[in-house]
Each structure stands twice: as C-alpha cells, then as structure tokens.
C-alpha cells in the first residue's frame, strides 16, 4: 500500500475526557503496598506476554480505573489507525515528509508493500542479499586486503544509530559468533577510540565499514580520514596503491551514493539506505552488516524475524494485552500525569550492557520534543530523562538515590530466565546467574514496598528507629523476563521499545522520527571551529570568547 500522500489529522488525546480523568487520578496518593494488599489477583491481571517476553507491570502506581482510562486515551487519539499508518508506509514523519518504514526491513519475502510505486520488500531483500554476500566473503576469508592477506578485523565507523545499534546487538549476541573475525566500533570524534584501537590492528588485515546515512557526518568522516591515512602509510611501504586500499579496505553504507563515490568507496562495496529509515531505527538494514559479519547471516535473519514477530503482535493484539501499547501508556502515565521525569533501564545480564545507551538515544532523540506535529507548543511533560546500567553495577552506583533519594524514578528491570543451559546443572556460572536473578527480583520488591518488604524477613531492620536506614518504597517499575537471550528474542525486545516510543509519541501528538534539536549545535560548531583558526576576537558571547581565548593561549 502506498499512503505517503495521506495527510490525515488524527484526534488529539490532549483534548479527550480521559486526559482529564487521568489528571484527576494522578492527584491521588498512590501506595503500591496498599494496591497489592487490596487485590491478590493484581499480578495475574497486570502482566502480559508475547513470545519469549513476559512483562509484569503490577508494580506500577496504577489501578484498573487508571488502566482503563489509559486504554481509552489510546483509542481517543486513534492509536489503531496510527499503528496501521506506520506499518503501511504513511507519511508519519511529517516534518521531513517521509514514511518511517523500519518495520519493512524485517518483512518476509512473501509480504507486499509498495511505496511511491516501488516494491519495498523486493528492495529490502535485494539489500539483505548484498549484506549476506559481503559478510560471507569476510567471514570465509575470501576478502583479502591490499597485500593479499585475509581480513581478521572489521572496524565499524559510525555515530548515533550507525554505531549504538550494531554495537549493542553484537555485544549481546557475541556467544553466537562463529567466526574468528573480530568486530570493533569507533564513534568518538576526538580520535581517542580510533587511536587506541589502531595500535593493536594490522593494516593489511583490517576492513573499515563507514556507516553514515548522509555520508556527511563530521564525526564519522574525520575518523574515516584518519583510518585511510593509517592504511596508506603502510600500503606505500608494501607497494600498495590508494586505489587498492580503498577497494579492499572500505565498505560504505549510506543513502547518498554520490558522496560515497566521491570519498572513494567503490560501487560494488556500497550498501544503500533509504530516506525512510531513521538512523536510530536502522540496525535492521545494511547498517547491521557488522552484526551479520559477527554472528552470520542466519543469526541476523533470526534477529529480523524476532522483530517482525513483535511487529505482528503490535499490529494485532488487543491493547489490553499489547506489550508495546501497555509499556508506552505506562510511560505516559508516569511522565505526563504523575510527573515522574526520570526513567532508568536496568538489565540484569552483562550481555545487555549497551542496551541502556541504545534506549537512551531511541527514546530521548525520538520523543524529546516540545512542539506537536501541528506546530503547537506543548504544555505537558513528554519524554523523561532516561539512563541505565547493568543492574548489579548500578546497585553499587545509583541505587542509593533510587531507594533513599528525593526523586521519584520509574524503572525497567530486564532479565533472562535461562542461561548456561549447555552446562552441567548447578555449576558456578549457573549459581552466578541465579544470584543475578535473585538480585533483580529483590531490588524491584524493595523499590516497590520499601521497609514493608523487609518486615516479613527481618523485623529488627524494618522497625529500626534510625531514619537514615529507612526505605520509603513506592518507586514504580516494570519487570521484563526473557525466556532466553537469542537473536530472535533480542529482536523482539528491541522492536518492543521501538513501538513503545511510537505509542508515547502518538499520545503526545509529536513526531518521533525527526531530530531537529541536534542540528544547530553542528552549525555552531563549524563557526566556532572557524574562529579557532583565526586571529582576533571571536564574534560570540563573552563566555565562549573567553574559553576560545584560553584554548588559543595553550595551543
């Protein structure tokens, strides 16, 4: 279906009677301890499952009446129609007049989707075929560097969505790696990452992937330029040419083939993106080449299949059982109505170490907006500040604030039920995994119930008169349990959060697919950089001018 010209104006949740009901409900003094005491079926009713993902949201500060109002709020803004518009290629990115078809990147070959008279599914699978061919050449050792040696290391140069997604996924799925080719990631513009990495790599056996949708991102291109210089310095000593270095040591991934060619990427090593793929939603595309190299194309296809299964759940499940809808509505309830303006993601699994950073970009860059799609200034809270860390590490870092600070913070606990199943039972590794699961459940319990959670097991601590030992509880949280971390379940988990973002944006009536807030800083950086190269006074504010003067004096 081609619906890009559909400029439908949807009903606004802001003007719904359910918005006012939720505002009134938010004035109540919510007590999680009381909610659980009043209803022994609460957990069964306030939980849902899709495939390998089980979600318990019973520790959120809401009841049946609030949940019903949230579901009605979703209907009031025509969320079902908005979901179909997203999936069918409507112009949901209104400011840039584009579709946002990241879900098309994981459609099976049997699907049918047309956009501007172009067969999207055929184009996607043609690109996946190219990803498979290039990745297998690297994995099999048939891709050779300028000196004829097989590639041993691949460096993905990108930033934002061109870095965080592949980095997060390859780290999470590293135990599925079935190749001796190592994959590395470089994003920092100051060169520190790249400089430290190159000291340990062999120029003759290193392949670089330059990932940039525009192929104009200064962070990425400055690192790519340094990488090329490093390669050429060695190639000249080995009678290699610049052409052989560019042909054998660089792959480009971008929506701008002209810029790739101008930089020197050979056409057969260019992978195309589409304008309807946003950077933070792009790991399913050719941007995922590094993932395919590391875990193989079969694993990458399983990642796509897992995401597609969540797409189908999102499109078909009743809202009351729909994980992305529920997760998004709860986030709106917390941020907009309860004014819980901080949210933390706490995976109790070291393989998910980069998930919090990935979700920080996904949510804050998507929904950190203060203007509606129609240009109206927003008078309600939207996206909360989001951060996170591996749960066991966070316990020794910022859990003190969660338990006894003055800020209310909502939490997502994430854990994998099965791990080390290939080991004999009760091994030290399995014991460690059980300990991690126990900590996950324990922390969510104490955050919810505070001292009341301890009273049942240690009355002395619970009744201690020392106020500095008091746990107030009542911190809202959701717990996501994954049967087992696999490419399929990881794909479903990531898609769950993608769709959560869209649900929130639909309620808030904002565009989650642009990021105009990052543009002015880039433009100003160019002006500041020019001023660094010039003599005399800079034309900025006194603070910036003084800082520039100090830098010049020390340079």
Swiss-Prot record:
Q: What is its EC number?
A: 5.3.1.9
Per UniProt, the enzyme's principal EC class comes to: isomerase
Please name one Pfam family that this protein belongs to: PGI
Gene Ontology CC, one term: cytosol
InterPro entries with a match to the protein in the record = G6P_Isomerase, G6P_Isomerase_C, Phosphoglucose_isomerase_CS, SIS_dom_sf, SIS_PGI_1, SIS_PGI_2
The pathway is:
Carbohydrate biosynthesis; gluconeogenesis; Carbohydrate degradation; glycolysis; D-glyceraldehyde 3-phosphate and glycerone phosphate from D-glucose: step 2/4
Keyword annotations: Cytoplasm, Gluconeogenesis, Glycolysis, Isomerase
Keyword Isomerase, does the record have it? yes
- According to its UniProt record, which residues of this chain constitute the active site? 365 (proton donor), 396, 522
Lineage top rank: taxon: Bacteria
Provide a Gene Ontology MF annotation, just one: monosaccharide binding
Q: Which CDD domains match?
A: SIS_PGI_1, SIS_PGI_2
Q: What is its main location?
A: cytoplasm
Leader sequence range is: none
Q: Where in the cell is it found?
A: Cytoplasm
Which Gene Ontology BP terms does the record give?
A: gluconeogenesis; glucose 6-phosphate metabolic process; glycolytic process
Chemical reaction(s) catalysed: alpha-D-glucose 6-phosphate = beta-D-fructose 6-phosphate
What family is reported?
A: Belongs to the GPI family.
Q: What does this protein do?
A: Catalyzes the reversible isomerization of glucose-6-phosphate to fructose-6-phosphate.
List, alphabetically, the HAMAP family matched.
Answer: G6P_isomerase (MF_00473)
- What is the protein name for this chain? Glucose-6-phosphate isomerase
